[in-house]
């Protein structure tokens, strides 16, 4: 009976580790393309106008009702993007 319990425990834990590994890669981003960036830049994502929150900086969190809350870009000309390894943020010209 103890062997059966160990086998069942391994069968329960093993799939979780594979799921976590795949989930971690998906969150960090893949090098094949930036599908999330394209998703965020579509017109129906409820992107709000960026507000001054970090003066003088070209990087910050972007205003998105479902994603970033009240954290905003430094300038109104910035657009919301997804940067690999840095997460959601702003892309500002110049």
From Swiss-Prot:
Where expressed (tissues)? Expressed by the venom duct.
GO CC, sorted alphabetically, is: extracellular region; host cell postsynaptic membrane
- State the protein's name: Alpha-conotoxin Cp20.3
Query: What is the documented function of this protein?
Result: Alpha-D-conopeptides act on postsynaptic membranes, they bind to the nicotinic acetylcholine receptors (nAChR) and thus inhibit them. Through its two C-terminal domains, this homodimeric protein would bind to two nAChR allosteric sites, located outside the nAChR C-loop of the principal binding face and at the adjacent binding interface in a clockwise direction. This toxin specifically blocks mammalian neuronal nAChR of the alpha-7/CHRNA7 (IC(50)=0.25 nM), alpha-3-beta-2/CHRNA3-CHRNB2 (IC(50)=2.8 nM), and alpha-4-beta-2/CHRNA4-CHRNB2 (IC(50)=28.6 nM) subtypes.
Q: Which keywords, in A-to-Z order, does the entry hold?
A: Acetylcholine receptor inhibiting toxin, Disulfide bond, Gamma-carboxyglutamic acid, Hydroxylation, Ion channel impairing toxin, Neurotoxin, Postsynaptic neurotoxin, Secreted, Signal, Toxin
Residues modified as 4-carboxyglutamate: 46, 49
Query: Where located?
Result: Secreted
Into which family does the record put it? Answer: Belongs to the conotoxin D superfamily.
What is annotated about its quaternary structure and interactions? Answer: Hetero-, homo- or pseudo-homodimer (identical sequence, different post-translational modifications).
Q: Which residues form the propeptide?
A: 25-45
Q: Does this entry carry the keyword Disulfide bond?
A: yes
Cite the source lineage. Eukaryota, Metazoa, Spiralia, Lophotrochozoa, Mollusca
User: Could you state a single Gene Ontology molecular function term?
Assistant: toxin activity
What's the entry's take on its domains? Answer: The cysteine framework is XX (C-CC-C-CC-C-C-C-C). Displays a mini-granulin fold, a structure composed of two short, stacked beta-hairpins connected by two parallel disulfide bonds. This newly described fold is derived from the same cysteine connectivity as knottins (ICK fold). The name 'mini-granulin fold' comes from the structural homology with the N-terminal region of the human granulin.
Signal peptide residues on this chain, from the entry's feature table: 1-24
Q: Which residues carry this modification: 4-hydroxyproline?
A: 55
**Main location per the UniProt record:** secreted
Which residues are connected by disulfide bridges in this protein? 63-72, 68-80, 73-90, 78-92
């Amino acid at each position: 009976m103890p062997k059966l319990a160990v086998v069942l425990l391994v069968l329960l834990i093993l799939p979780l580790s594979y799921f976590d590994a795949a989930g971690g890669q998906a969150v960090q981003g893949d090098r094949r393309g930036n599908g999330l960036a394209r998703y965020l830049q579509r017109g129906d994502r409820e992107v709000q106008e960026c507000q001054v929150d970090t003066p003088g900086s070209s990087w910050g969190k972007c205003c998105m009702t479902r994603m970033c809350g009240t954290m905003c870009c430094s300038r109104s000309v910035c657009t919301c993007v997804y940067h690999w390894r840095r997460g959601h943020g702003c892309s500002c010209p110049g």
